[in-house]
């Protein structure tokens, strides 16, 4: 199924869980984390330094592989929509087919969201048979509007089930997932609708108008409306952040869209645990490790590290100080 592609077992395949892909581009290019070179280890031709310094080009294989992965899933989604539409046109077509079409459209919109967020101007490819000569770059605002329209059109047909909980809709696109994507889109409307980010000005969320049902509101009101919808479907913040990451976290009322790590359902890979540990960290715990991603100074300052007012969530998020054998 399409959901087999959300996670993955190979580098650059999957929205999360694997290396050298979407997660790395959204983490190791920011002021949150970096993957340092220690000695000669993990220099990799300057790959990781280049990501952190925003010094990359067309030959960066992490960027190229992420682009190819996202469009691969979009083309597969197009094929699914085309096949479902064929079935819908039959006289004996079951009524619930429209729900499946909406689910795939919203699923495809999620992948376009990642392309919009990471690349800005991207081609809108809506057919599995579009020849390369007809693949043209779309303006960032046009991609934004397409994603919003697809998600809003799909909403009435999506189930309200909690996608993070085991059952028929485990790991699937549901109404809460679509609402969280819409909230994120409008929260970043000033970036996503800015077609010229070099002129020193940008659109204003307070004046950007959007229709939700029969009401016309501004972007900030749209964010609130979709967040209220999510809350109304039974979501709330956990009292302790770390509870969202326990082994059996399916009951979480905060997690909205998760990738199932279930050998009986969707078998996916989660490399970040051992990847975040340095070899010596892993050795202390009797586990594997790699060169170890590191928090930046900015991140440590944000958490109040090495001060009298360190954020209580710091210990749940980072290895720091002396790492001891738990035995």
Q: Residue spans of the language-model regions?
A:
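Extended, well-ordered alpha-helical scaffold segments
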Residues: 96-103, 142-150, 208-230
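Short coil/turn linking the two alpha-helices of tandem helical-hairpin repeats
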Residues: 114-117, 123, 162, 188-197
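Elongated scaffold/linker segments in the mid-to-C-terminal portions of large proteins
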Residues: 1, 7-13, 19, 32-33, ...
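Extracellular structured ligand-interaction cores
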Residues: 99, 106, 121, 173-180, ...
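A solvent-exposed, charged loop/short amphipathic helix patch at secondary-structure junctions
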Residues: 196-213
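Conserved, well-structured interaction surfaces
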Residues: 2-15, 36-119, 131-145, 149-167
